[in-house]
Structure formats: structure tokens, C-alpha cells
């Protein structure tokens, strides 16, 4: 599609604030990127155009071409306000060399919390006899990773109630505490993992791609081999993780709705454009046919210097089992409040139940202000 009078802009450092100011001045771009954390707000305040009339009438458009979770990321209260442009699933990076040294079999994609705990317990040790632990099970495994893989839903759909005291979430937090206790709540860093002293690390696929650039990995990333698998499942859940989606929408102020829709499709729906996600960005395409294509695999193999057949299957599994965060205006504020209090909850040995209940009540109050 060629339009001589079409202006194309670039992302700003303070993009969300810049876009909000544009909206206040009535000067929004016709088509713009929507960050995951902004989508609920932008939808609820009327910045984004309702796309239902286009998605349902345009015979050249089929929502079934998208991974369901990615397409649904652009839905707010039953209405489509955006299309997914790029998806970023989370996976578990595994230090295969360390596991081999400890005579531990590489876990499969359907491993459990119990498997995870036993491996972490076995590898955590003082290897040089100086009285300090120097080898560990996991870096950066968070309470929310455990919550998502244990079927926990942090909030109700309408965003009026926090489920922090529900059994799946309490058990997820207790499991995270149990995992951290193995390493005596040591404040580990990414350098510890990079040095080959940690078995596992949850990581987004975009981080994974930049972590393994070829040929730099040979001389930059030490002498351990690694692989990636799905995160372990809890007793009440499955091997599921969150998938973040960069979205694109149309301004509700646009006077060029049809042209904007064609441009939006070109960016988010056209195969040729979406193939470039693998070349020029670090995520993957939300279109099933593109992510499962030979072209995508070849691009990844060239950039990462290894056979990607198994990892392409893993990406497809992750995308088909994506978990979406709830969409309501105060989600980010409520989540950040919970996350900031979690260190205290994880390290306080005495007051777990009362701390959880108190925080739940505070969040419920925040949600209903």
C-alpha cells in the first residue's frame, strides 16, 4: 500500500506519556503502537477505535490466523480495540552443563514443581569448601511465575476483587518461598547465572535471543551449554506462562478509518511484514503461519547459530498455551503494589497468613476506590 501523504513516526523514549499528551491535544496518530500496560487505559478512556466493524466485515481478514491468546490481548470488555503486532512468550533457560555435571537428566516440557524443587535442592551447594554456597538452583523465579503455572488468577475479570488469599495463589507463594529458602534467600544476580553457577533462569524469548547472539556466544558466553523449556507446573495448574503482546490500534479521532485499517492490516496481518519481526525485532509473530514457517526458522538459526527445530515447536506450544493478564484500568497499580510487598511476605517466617490477608484487603480497597 503506497500513500504519498502518509506520515510514519518512530517510538519515543517516554512513549506512553507522549501518546497521552497527543490524545489530550486531539492530535493522535491515526495508527499507533499500544504497550501491554497501556491497553486497558487507552481502551477505557476512548483513545482507541472499535475495530469490530472492520474485523467482522473485511472478508480478507480472519482472526483465526492469529494465536488466540495474542488476538484476545487486543480485546477489552468483549470489543476488539487493537491487533497484535509482536508477541513475547516466557520460557525457562536451563544450564545443561551444570545438570550434566550433577548427573541430572534434562527435564522435559511437562515437568512439575516437585521436579523443579528436587533439582534446585540437589544442585545448591558449596563446591569449593569455603563454607559459602556458590552453586544454585534458580535465578529470578518469581511468585507470579508460580502463580500462573498453578492456575492462579490474581484478580477477578472486572478488576474489583483480589484473589491473593485463594488456595492456588497461596500455594504458589509458599512454593516460591520454599525455592528461595534452598539458597538461604541469597540475592543472586544475572552474573551468577552467566558464570555457569545456576541451573535455571526464567526469561522472555526476546531476552533469550539477545542472550545468545551468534557468533558472540562462543567467546562471550563462557563454556556451558544451555537450552530452553516450559516453566514447571504446579499441582493445580499446567506448564503455562504469560505472553506479552505489543499491540497496534487506530485512533478514535481518525478521519481516515478505512485507510488506517488497511495500514494496520499491513503491519499486523500481512505475512511479508510479519516475517520481518524475526529479522529486525526480538519477539515472534502472533500469526500462526508466520511463526511456524521455514523462513522464520531459518532467520532464527542464522542469528543464533544452531538448529531451531525443537525450539520452534516449543514456541508454538507456548503461544497456544498463553495466559493473558486481566484487563482493567488499575491492574498495573494493583499488581505493582502486591509485587512490592512480596519480599516481606516471602521472608517473614511468622505472619504469612495475616500478611496475605492484610495485603488482599488493601488491594481490594484500591480496586474499589
Language-model segments: residues:
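C-terminal capping/gating helix-and-loop segments adjacent to ligand/active sites or protein-protein/ligand interfaces
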Residues: 242, 302-367
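Hinge/lid segment of periplasmic solute-binding proteins
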Residues: 11, 34-89, 223-232
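Early extracytoplasmic/lumenal segment of secretory-pathway proteins
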Residues: 1-36
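Glycine-centered hinge/linker elements that transmit conformational signals in sensory
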Residues: 119-120, 158-187, 231
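Paired acidic/hydrophobic, glycine-rich loop segments that form the ligand-binding mouth/hinge
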Residues: 30-33, 199-204, 209-211, 222
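Mature extracytoplasmic/periplasmic domains
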Residues: 216, 246-332
Amino acid at each position: 500500500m503506497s500513500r504519498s501523504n502518509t506520515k510514519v513516526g518512530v517510538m519515543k523514549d517516554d512513549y506512553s506519556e507522549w501518546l497521552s499528551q497527543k490524545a489530550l491535544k486531539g492530535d493522535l496518530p491515526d495508527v499507533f503502537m499500544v504497550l501491554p500496560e497501556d491497553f486497558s487505559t487507552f481502551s477505557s478512556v476512548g483513545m482507541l477505535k472499535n475495530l469490530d466493524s472492520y474485523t467482522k466485515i473485511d472478508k480478507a481478514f480472519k482472526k483465526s490466523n492469529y494465536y488466540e491468546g495474542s488476538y484476545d490481548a487486543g480485546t477489552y470488555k468483549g470489543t476488539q480495540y487493537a491487533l497484535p503486532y509482536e508477541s513475547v512468550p516466557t520460557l525457562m533457560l536451563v544450564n545443561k552443563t551444570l545438570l550434566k555435571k550433577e548427573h541430572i537428566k534434562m527435564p522435559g516440557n511437562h515437568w512439575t514443581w516437585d521436579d523443579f524443587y528436587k533439582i534446585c535442592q540437589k544442585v545448591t551447594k558449596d563446591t569449593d569448601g569455603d563454607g559459602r554456597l556458590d552453586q544454585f538452583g534458580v535465578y529470578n523465579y518469581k511468585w507470579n511465575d508460580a502463580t500462573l503455572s498453578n492456575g492462579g488468577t490474581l484478580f477477578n475479570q472486572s478488576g474489583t476483587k483480589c484473589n491473593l488469599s485463594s488456595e492456588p495463589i497461596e500455594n504458589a507463594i509458599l512454593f516460591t518461598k520454599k525455592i528461595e529458602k534452598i539458597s538461604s534467600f541469597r540475592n543472586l544476580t544475572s552474573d551468577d547465572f552467566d558464570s555457569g553457577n545456576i541451573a535455571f533462569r526464567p526469561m522472555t524469548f526476546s531476552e533469550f535471543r539477545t542472550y545468545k547472539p551468534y557468533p558472540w556466544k562462543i567467546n562471550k558466553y563462557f563454556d556451558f551449554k544451555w537450552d530452553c523449556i516450559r516453566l514447571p507446573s504446579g499441582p493445580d495448574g499446567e506448564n503455562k506462562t504469560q505472553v506479552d503482546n505489543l499491540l497496534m490500534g487506530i485512533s478514535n479521532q481518525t478521519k481516515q478509518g478505512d485507510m488506517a485499517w488497511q495500514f494496520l492490516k499491513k503491519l499486523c496481518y500481512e505475512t511479508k511484514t510479519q516475517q520481518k519481526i524475526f529479522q529486525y525485532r526480538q519477539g515472534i509473530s502472533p500469526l500462526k503461519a508466520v511463526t511456524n514457517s521455514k523462513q522464520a526458522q531459518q532467520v532464527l538459526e542464522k542469528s543464533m547459530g544452531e538448529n531451531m527445530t525443537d525450539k520452534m515447536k516449543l514456541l508454538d506450544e507456548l503461544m497456544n498455551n498463553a495466559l493473558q493478564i486481566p484487563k482493567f484500568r488499575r491492574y498495573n497499580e494493583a499488581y505493582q503494589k502486591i509485587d512490592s510487598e512480596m519480599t516481606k511476605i516471602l521472608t517473614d517466617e511468622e505472619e504469612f497468613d495475616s500478611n496475605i490477608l492484610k495485603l488482599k484487603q488493601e488491594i481490594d480497597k484500591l480496586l474499589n476506590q
